[in-house]
């Protein structure tokens, strides 16, 4: 008898989680209604107290941010730096992006990023802190400081996933979307056969 209750509980829990494609954004009392392009969803401010919805690369604000996101963790240093000059092999540009309309979510779907939301009765915009390769170094020119006689190299954007308010198939939800976070160097050894 106890095993059957446990199995029923397990089945009901797994069915509940299987039906959740994303964390549905609580809106007005008309929760299940279709979302049109003109509606701005209302978000409960208590949602931002949850750690899973906070990211230093995503910001909801009425005005564009002035500075880079604050770092929550600092690296420990044992002593003075051993190397005098530390240089990046790929030049990059970091900025707050406020006009993102489309993005790719973690399942590969192209979703619509909601530009505006209402939090505490004020309209706020979603901003994403992105780092991209400088246009001059992307592609065939190679990375800085790499020996071109022995190595093929190029700079490319690296990505991560952050939570954002999105719309997909008329359902507004928190989804993980891909944004650019770094410019990295890709190396391959040149063939010795010429």
Swiss-Prot record:
Which terms in the Gene Ontology molecular function aspect does this entry carry?
growth factor activity; nerve growth factor receptor binding
Q: Which cysteines are joined by disulfide bonds?
A: 90-155, 133-183, 143-185
Q: Which domain of life is it from?
A: Eukaryota
Q: Does the keyword Disulfide bond apply?
A: yes
Question: Its GO biological process terms?
Answer: cell surface receptor protein tyrosine kinase signaling pathway; modulation of chemical synaptic transmission; negative regulation of neuron apoptotic process; nerve development; nerve growth factor signaling pathway; neuron projection morphogenesis
Could you tell me where this protein is found in the cell?
Secreted
Secretion signal span: 1-18
Glycosylation is annotated at 99, 120
- Region span, Disordered: 54-84
Coiled coil located at which positions? none
GO CC, alphabetical = axon; dendrite; extracellular space; synaptic vesicle
Q: What's this protein's family per the entry?
A: Belongs to the NGF-beta family.
Protein function: Nerve growth factor is important for the development and maintenance of the sympathetic and sensory nervous systems. It stimulates division and differentiation of sympathetic and embryonic sensory neurons.
Its name, as the record gives it, is Nerve growth factor
What lineage is on file? Eukaryota, Metazoa, Chordata, Craniata, Vertebrata
């Amino acid at each position: 008898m106890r095993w059957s209750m446990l199995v029923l509980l397990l089945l009901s829990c797994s069915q509940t989680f299987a039906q959740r494609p994303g964390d549905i954004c609580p809106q007005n009392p008309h929760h299940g209604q279709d979302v049109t392009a003109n509606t701005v969803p209302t978000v409960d401010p208590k949602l931002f107290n949850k750690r899973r919805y906070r990211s230093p690369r995503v910001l909801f604000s009425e005005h564009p941010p002035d500075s880079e996101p604050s770092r929550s963790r600092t690296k420990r240093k044992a002593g003075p730096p051993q190397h005098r000059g530390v240089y990046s092999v790929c030049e990059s540009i970091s900025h707050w992006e406020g006009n993102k309309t489309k993005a790719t979510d973690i399942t590969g779907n192209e979703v619509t990023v909601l530009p505006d939301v209402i939090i505490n009765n004020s309209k706020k915009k979603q901003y994403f802190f992105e780092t991209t390769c400088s246009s001059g170094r992307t592609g065939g020119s190679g990375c800085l400081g790499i020996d071109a006689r022995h190595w093929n190299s190029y700079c490319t954007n690296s990505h991560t996933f952050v939570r954002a308010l999105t719309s997909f198939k008329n359902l507004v939800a928190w989804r993980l979307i891909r944004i650019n976070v770094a410019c990295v160097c890709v190396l391959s050894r040149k063939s010795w056969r010429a």
